[in-house]
Protein backbone atom coordinates (compact mmCIF):
# COMPACT_ATOMS: atom_id res chain seq x y z
CA UNK A 1 0.00 0.00 0.00
CA UNK A 2 1.35 3.40 -0.97
CA UNK A 3 1.39 5.83 1.93
CA UNK A 4 0.00 9.31 1.45
CA UNK A 5 1.50 12.43 2.98
CA UNK A 6 -1.18 12.31 5.67
CA UNK A 7 -0.28 8.70 6.49
CA UNK A 8 3.38 9.63 6.89
CA UNK A 9 2.44 12.53 9.17
CA UNK A 10 0.31 10.18 11.28
CA UNK A 11 3.17 7.70 11.59
CA UNK A 12 5.62 10.44 12.53
CA UNK A 13 3.24 11.82 15.16
CA UNK A 14 2.63 8.38 16.68
CA UNK A 15 6.35 7.62 16.69
CA UNK A 16 7.07 11.01 18.25
CA UNK A 17 4.51 10.39 21.00
CA UNK A 18 6.12 7.05 21.81
CA UNK A 19 9.63 8.52 21.84
CA UNK A 20 8.43 11.27 24.18
CA UNK A 21 7.13 8.52 26.47
CA UNK A 22 10.54 6.83 26.35
CA UNK A 23 12.23 10.14 27.11
CA UNK A 24 9.88 10.85 30.01
CA UNK A 25 10.59 7.40 31.40
CA UNK A 26 14.38 7.46 31.03
CA UNK A 27 15.11 11.20 31.35
CA UNK A 28 18.50 10.54 29.73
CA UNK A 29 19.81 8.88 32.88
CA UNK A 30 17.77 5.72 33.46
CA UNK A 31 17.72 2.50 31.47
CA UNK A 32 14.70 1.74 29.32
CA UNK A 33 13.84 -1.30 31.37
CA UNK A 34 13.78 -2.76 34.84
CA UNK A 35 17.28 -2.51 36.28
CA UNK A 36 16.58 -5.44 38.61
CA UNK A 37 15.05 -7.90 36.13
CA UNK A 38 16.97 -6.78 33.06
CA UNK A 39 20.35 -6.66 34.76
CA UNK A 40 20.04 -10.20 36.08
CA UNK A 41 18.02 -11.74 33.27
CA UNK A 42 17.18 -9.88 30.06
CA UNK A 43 20.70 -8.48 29.54
CA UNK A 44 22.76 -11.14 31.26
CA UNK A 45 21.35 -14.34 29.75
CA UNK A 46 21.28 -13.25 26.07
CA UNK A 47 24.80 -11.91 26.61
CA UNK A 48 25.77 -15.34 27.94
CA UNK A 49 24.30 -16.98 24.80
CA UNK A 50 26.39 -14.69 22.62
CA UNK A 51 29.61 -15.19 24.59
CA UNK A 52 29.10 -18.95 24.65
CA UNK A 53 28.71 -18.96 20.88
CA UNK A 54 31.94 -17.03 20.36
CA UNK A 55 33.76 -19.22 22.86
CA UNK A 56 32.62 -22.59 21.50
CA UNK A 57 31.53 -21.81 17.94
CA UNK A 58 28.55 -24.06 18.61
CA UNK A 59 25.29 -22.64 17.30
CA UNK A 60 23.28 -25.41 18.99
CA UNK A 61 24.80 -25.83 22.46
CA UNK A 62 23.13 -28.22 24.86
CA UNK A 63 24.80 -27.24 28.12
CA UNK A 64 25.33 -23.96 29.95
CA UNK A 65 28.33 -24.67 32.21
CA UNK A 66 28.45 -21.23 33.84
CA UNK A 67 24.80 -20.94 34.86
CA UNK A 68 24.41 -22.12 38.44
CA UNK A 69 26.20 -25.46 38.65
CA UNK A 70 25.62 -26.02 34.96
CA UNK A 71 22.30 -26.80 33.33
CA UNK A 72 20.55 -27.70 30.11
CA UNK A 73 20.69 -24.56 28.01
CA UNK A 74 17.15 -25.10 26.77
CA UNK A 75 15.92 -24.32 30.26
CA UNK A 76 16.88 -20.76 29.33
CA UNK A 77 15.01 -20.67 26.02
CA UNK A 78 12.56 -18.31 27.71
CA UNK A 79 15.18 -15.58 27.22
CA UNK A 80 15.35 -15.85 23.44
CA UNK A 81 17.85 -18.63 22.78
CA UNK A 82 17.01 -18.76 19.05
CA UNK A 83 15.02 -15.58 18.77
CA UNK A 84 15.93 -13.78 15.51
CA UNK A 85 16.07 -10.59 17.54
CA UNK A 86 18.71 -12.00 19.89
CA UNK A 87 20.58 -13.87 17.15
CA UNK A 88 21.14 -10.61 15.29
CA UNK A 89 23.21 -9.41 18.25
CA UNK A 90 25.74 -12.14 17.42
CA UNK A 91 26.73 -9.98 14.45
CA UNK A 92 27.39 -7.06 16.79
CA UNK A 93 29.77 -8.37 19.48
CA UNK A 94 31.11 -4.84 20.00
CA UNK A 95 27.69 -3.59 21.17
CA UNK A 96 26.92 -4.08 24.87
CA UNK A 97 23.94 -6.36 25.33
CA UNK A 98 22.34 -3.88 27.71
CA UNK A 99 22.44 -1.24 24.98
CA UNK A 100 21.31 -3.67 22.30
CA UNK A 101 18.26 -4.91 24.24
CA UNK A 102 17.07 -1.38 24.94
CA UNK A 103 17.46 -0.35 21.30
CA UNK A 104 15.70 -3.39 19.84
CA UNK A 105 12.90 -3.04 22.39
CA UNK A 106 12.22 0.51 21.24
CA UNK A 107 12.59 -0.39 17.56
CA UNK A 108 10.27 -3.36 18.04
CA UNK A 109 7.47 -1.18 19.40
CA UNK A 110 7.92 1.37 16.61
CA UNK A 111 7.88 -1.40 14.00
CA UNK A 112 4.74 -2.90 15.56
CA UNK A 113 3.10 0.51 15.57
CA UNK A 114 3.87 1.17 11.90
CA UNK A 115 2.74 -2.29 10.82
CA UNK A 116 -0.48 -1.98 12.81
CA UNK A 117 -1.22 1.44 11.30
CA UNK A 118 -0.64 0.20 7.76
CA UNK A 119 -2.84 -2.83 8.42
CA UNK A 120 -5.64 -0.68 9.81
CA UNK A 121 -5.27 1.79 6.95
CA UNK A 122 -6.10 -1.02 4.54
CA UNK A 123 -9.47 -1.38 6.25
CA UNK A 124 -10.44 2.04 7.59
CA UNK A 125 -10.02 5.76 6.96
CA UNK A 126 -6.79 7.58 7.79
CA UNK A 127 -8.19 9.13 10.97
CA UNK A 128 -9.68 5.86 12.20
CA UNK A 129 -6.38 4.07 11.58
CA UNK A 130 -4.59 6.80 13.53
CA UNK A 131 -6.98 6.51 16.49
CA UNK A 132 -6.79 2.71 16.56
CA UNK A 133 -2.99 2.83 16.36
CA UNK A 134 -2.85 5.27 19.27
CA UNK A 135 -4.97 2.91 21.38
CA UNK A 136 -2.79 -0.02 20.29
CA UNK A 137 0.41 1.84 21.22
CA UNK A 138 -0.76 2.65 24.73
CA UNK A 139 -2.46 -0.64 25.46
CA UNK A 140 -1.22 -1.65 28.89
CA UNK A 141 0.39 -4.99 27.93
CA UNK A 142 2.34 -3.50 25.02
CA UNK A 143 3.63 -0.31 26.60
CA UNK A 144 4.34 -1.91 29.99
CA UNK A 145 6.07 -5.07 28.85
CA UNK A 146 8.19 -3.20 26.29
CA UNK A 147 10.32 -2.04 29.22
CA UNK A 148 9.67 -4.82 31.70
CA UNK A 149 9.29 -8.28 30.13
CA UNK A 150 10.35 -8.06 26.51
CA UNK A 151 9.63 -11.70 25.67
CA UNK A 152 5.93 -10.93 26.05
CA UNK A 153 5.94 -8.33 23.25
CA UNK A 154 9.02 -8.75 21.04
CA UNK A 155 7.15 -11.18 18.78
CA UNK A 156 4.53 -8.52 17.99
CA UNK A 157 5.88 -7.34 14.57
CA UNK A 158 5.91 -10.94 13.33
CA UNK A 159 2.43 -11.60 14.73
CA UNK A 160 0.96 -8.58 12.97
CA UNK A 161 2.70 -9.44 9.71
CA UNK A 162 1.37 -12.96 10.13
CA UNK A 163 -2.20 -11.67 10.43
CA UNK A 164 -1.72 -9.62 7.28
CA UNK A 165 -0.25 -12.64 5.50
CA UNK A 166 -3.27 -14.75 6.48
CA UNK A 167 -5.52 -12.23 4.77
CA UNK A 168 -3.28 -12.35 1.70
CA UNK A 169 -3.42 -16.15 1.79
CA UNK A 170 -7.19 -16.21 1.54
CA UNK A 171 -6.99 -13.69 -1.29
CA UNK A 172 -4.59 -15.98 -3.15
CA UNK A 173 -1.50 -13.80 -2.66
CA UNK A 174 1.97 -14.77 -1.38
CA UNK A 175 0.90 -17.92 0.42
CA UNK A 176 4.41 -18.70 1.68
CA UNK A 177 4.52 -15.53 3.80
CA UNK A 178 2.22 -17.06 6.41
CA UNK A 179 4.83 -19.75 7.05
CA UNK A 180 7.68 -17.23 7.20
CA UNK A 181 6.08 -14.89 9.74
CA UNK A 182 4.72 -17.77 11.84
CA UNK A 183 8.21 -19.32 11.95
CA UNK A 184 9.84 -16.06 13.07
CA UNK A 185 7.12 -15.47 15.65
CA UNK A 186 7.47 -18.97 17.10
CA UNK A 187 11.27 -18.75 17.20
CA UNK A 188 10.96 -15.49 19.10
CA UNK A 189 8.77 -17.07 21.78
CA UNK A 190 8.83 -20.81 21.17
CA UNK A 191 9.11 -21.38 24.91
CA UNK A 192 5.40 -20.54 25.07
CA UNK A 193 4.44 -22.01 21.70
CA UNK A 194 5.22 -25.56 22.80
CA UNK A 195 2.47 -25.30 25.43
CA UNK A 196 -0.12 -25.35 22.66
CA UNK A 197 0.84 -28.94 21.89
CA UNK A 198 0.09 -30.32 25.33
CA UNK A 199 -3.52 -31.25 26.00
CA UNK A 200 -3.62 -29.92 29.56
CA UNK A 201 -2.22 -26.54 28.55
CA UNK A 202 -4.57 -26.35 25.58
CA UNK A 203 -7.55 -26.98 27.86
CA UNK A 204 -6.36 -24.22 30.19
CA UNK A 205 -6.01 -21.78 27.31
CA UNK A 206 -9.51 -22.55 26.10
Could you describe each region identified by the protein language model?
Residues 113, 117, 121, 159-168, ...:
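Hydrophobic transmembrane alpha-helices
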Residues 138, 142, 170, 184-192:
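Transmembrane helix irregularities
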Residues 162-177, 185:
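Membrane-interface transmembrane helices that cradle and orient dolichyl/undecaprenyl
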Residues 18-113, 134-157:
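Membrane-interface coil-to-helix junctions
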Residues 12, 103, 130-134, 176-180:
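Hydrophobic alpha-helical transmembrane segments
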Residues 197-206:
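Single conserved hydrophobic/aromatic residue that forms the stacking wall/gate
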Residues 1-25:
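Start-transfer (signal-anchor) and selected internal transmembrane alpha helices
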Residues 116-138:
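Transmembrane-helix signature of polytopic, membrane-embedded enzymes
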